[in-house]
């Protein structure tokens, strides 16, 4: 993983997010709720509002333009109110009847099946995407930007455009093109100098180099944002729909978040290799050293680009091809679609 410019901890985090997304997708497609809605209800005479699952012994009524809770983010909570009785006329006639104690006024609804597909799954995918952006920003900075630790730096010659240019020039033009490779070597020397200045006085360096500051800020924002989105996935354990979800769903959400936090913490506190050990590890002489460097450069560039292209292509194709179809088959048309 180090040859690809990715720490083992970062690779583990991407695998955990991917596994969590696959499990959530499987659970959403396989789960069958007898009643997929939960209701925020109160009695006729007024009282505390209580979220609860559907109860066959109760009569649920709703009033036009009378709701304490707005619909959630799934876009399908309205479907839970389609078959409810109108309370505008029924409540007045039922006050003096034996049905009085069984009537519940619905003040809010949640479609729990739609929540998993439209909220939980999308948050996991979004966290995966944002964390992937962070890793890409970080890899670019390891090649071109300043780093306080020289052990974090990787050779700019691993930049995939360098290899692509070399292949095109050798195959199509028939002669080697080395200007970009020489430029990247110059960039490497300049980067090392910038890293020394950055290590000596980071505040002044960031003040003098606004562009570098902006790029590093984007990297930090992507990292923090991905962590915040992962924390939001814990909402599955505290949403009103948690009444319908099995206990292992809530436990799994906590296990994933805690595991990600532990892995992130380990990546920060784990001792870094010293500069001498790092140089001794990467500087191998002779033909073996040349072959190792070339293979690492070529394979890292190809592997990282193929990884990104394949993953994003598959994600886009699946999302575009199946999302609307699955949503309609599971939940029917959304409220916005019906209005149009």
From Swiss-Prot:
Family: Belongs to the alphaherpesvirinae glycoprotein K family.
Name of the coding gene: gK
Subcellular location: Host cell membrane; Host endosome membrane; Host Golgi apparatus membrane
Subunit structure and binding partners: Interacts (via UL20 interaction region) with protein UL20 homolog (via N-terminus); this interaction probably plays a role in the coordinate transport of protein UL20 homolog and gK to the trans-Golgi network (TGN), and is required for the cell surface expression of gK.
Biological function: Glycoprotein that probably modulates membrane fusion events during secondary envelopment of cytoplasmic capsids that bud into specific trans-Golgi network (TGN)-derived membranes. Also plays a role, together with gB, in virus-induced cell-to-cell fusion (syncytia formation), which is extensive during VZV infection in cultured cells.
Keyword entries, A-Z: Glycoprotein, Host cell membrane, Host endosome, Host Golgi apparatus, Host membrane, Membrane, Signal, Syncytium formation induced by viral infection, Transmembrane, Transmembrane helix, Viral primary envelope fusion with host outer nuclear membrane, Viral release from host cell
Extracellular face residues: 22-114, 233-248, 320-340
Key word Endoplasmic reticulum present: no
Major location category of this protein: host cell
Species of the source: Varicella-zoster virus (strain Oka vaccine) (HHV-3)
GO BP terms, alphabetized: fusion of viral membrane with host outer nuclear membrane; symbiont-mediated induction of syncytium formation
Topology of the protein relative to the lipid bilayer: Multi-pass membrane protein
Record: glycosylation sites: 55, 65
Keyword Glycoprotein in annotation: yes
A GO cellular-component term linked to this record: host cell plasma membrane
Any one Pfam family match given in the protein's UniProt record, by short name: Fusion_gly_K
Signal sequence segment: 1-21
Record topology, Cytoplasmic segments: 136-211, 270-298
Entry protein name: Envelope glycoprotein K
InterPro entries per the UniProt record, alphabetical: GK
Segments traversing the membrane: 115-135, 212-232, 249-269, 299-319
Top-rank taxon: Viruses
């Amino acid at each position: 993983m180090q040859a690809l410019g990715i720490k083992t901890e970062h690779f583990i985090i991407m695998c955990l997010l991917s596994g969590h997304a696959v499990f959530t997708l499987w659970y959403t497609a396989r789960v069958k709720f007898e009643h997929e809605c939960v209701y925020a209800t109160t009695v006729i005479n007024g009282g505390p509002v209580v979220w609860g699952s559907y109860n066959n012994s109760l009569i649920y009524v709703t009033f036009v333009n009378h709701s304490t809770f707005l619909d959630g983010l799934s876009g399908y909570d309205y479907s839970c109110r389609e078959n409810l009785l109108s309370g505008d006329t029924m409540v007045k006639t039922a006050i003096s009847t034996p049905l009085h104690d069984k009537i519940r006024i619905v003040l809010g609804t949640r479609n729990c099946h739609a929540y998993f597909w439209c909220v939980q799954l999308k948050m996991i995918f979004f966290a995966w995407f944002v964390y992937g952006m962070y890793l890409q920003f970080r890899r670019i900075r390891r090649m071109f930007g300043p780093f306080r630790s020289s052990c974090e730096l990787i050779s700019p010659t691993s930049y995939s455009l360098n290899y692509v240019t070399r292949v095109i020039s050798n195959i199509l033009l028939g002669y080697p093109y080395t200007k970009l490779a020489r430029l990247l070597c110059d960039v490497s020397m300049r980067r090392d100098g910038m890293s020394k200045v950055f290590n000596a006085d980071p505040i002044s360096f960031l003040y003098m180099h606004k562009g570098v500051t902006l790029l590093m800020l984007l990297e930090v924002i992507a990292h923090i944002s991905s962590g915040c989105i992962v924390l939001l996935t814990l909402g599955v354990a505290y949403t009103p729909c948690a009444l319908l979800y099995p206990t292992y769903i809530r436990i799994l959400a906590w296990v994933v978040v805690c595991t990600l936090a532990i892995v992130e913490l380990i990546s920060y506190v784990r001792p870094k290799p010293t500069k001498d050990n790092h140089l001794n590890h990467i500087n191998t002489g002779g033909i073996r050293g040349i072959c190792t460097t070339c293979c690492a450069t070529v394979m890292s560039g190809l592997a990282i680009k193929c990884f990104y292209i394949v993953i994003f292509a598959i994600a886009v194709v699946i999302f575009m091809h199946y999302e609307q179809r699955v949503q309609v088959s599971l939940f029917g048309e959304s409220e916005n679609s019906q209005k149009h």
